Amino acid sequence: MKNVLIIFGKPYCSICENVSEAVEELKSEYDILHVDILSFFLKDGDSSMLGDVKRGTLIGNFAAHLSNYIVSIFKYNPQTKQMAFVDINKSLDFTKTDKSLVNLEILKSEIEKANYGVWPPVTE
């Protein structure tokens, strides 16, 4: 069973689309799940299944810790049910306007370095 990369992006966001396209190149190593963050957090969105308290905590955590990220990536281990935050910002080159804005070698390194169960995310 492969680990999963969960990509939280915004609709109509060209950077998010380019990141998603670049990360697809890792699909031989990971299952990839794309999540529209706005739809996810809508009142009737998928996050509603968590219940009001957990949903509120999740929204608060996103706002407090991930507001500096245009797109967020987590890796998930389905066997242990643990998640890890992946610092994608280190792999992005914002001077590029296509999927080459993601340096896949740096991203792979960040995926491997991401520690399960660490929250809030430690950023350098």
UniProtKB/Swiss-Prot annotation:
Keywords: Disulfide bond, Electron transport, Host cytoplasm, Redox-active center, Transport. Induction: Expressed in the intermediate phase of the viral replicative cycle. Its main location: host cell. It holds the Pfam family Glrx-like. Gene3D superfamilies: Glutaredoxin (3.40.30.10). Coiled coil: none annotated. It is found in: Host cytoplasm. The keyword Transport applies. Signal peptide: none annotated. One of its GO terms (cellular component) is host cell cytoplasm. Disulfide bonds join C13-C16. Glutaredoxin necessary for virion morphogenesis and virus replication. Functions as a thiol-disulfide transfer protein between membrane-associated OPG128 and substrates OPG095 or OPG053. The complete pathway for formation of disulfide bonds in intracellular virion membrane proteins sequentially involves oxidation of OPG072, OPG128 and OPG088. Exhibit thioltransferase and dehydroascorbate reductase activities in vitro. Belongs to the glutaredoxin family. Homodimer. This is Glutaredoxin-2. It comes from Variola virus (isolate Human/India/Ind3/1967) (VARV). The lineage of its organism: Viruses, Varidnaviria, Bamfordvirae, Nucleocytoviricota, Pokkesviricetes.
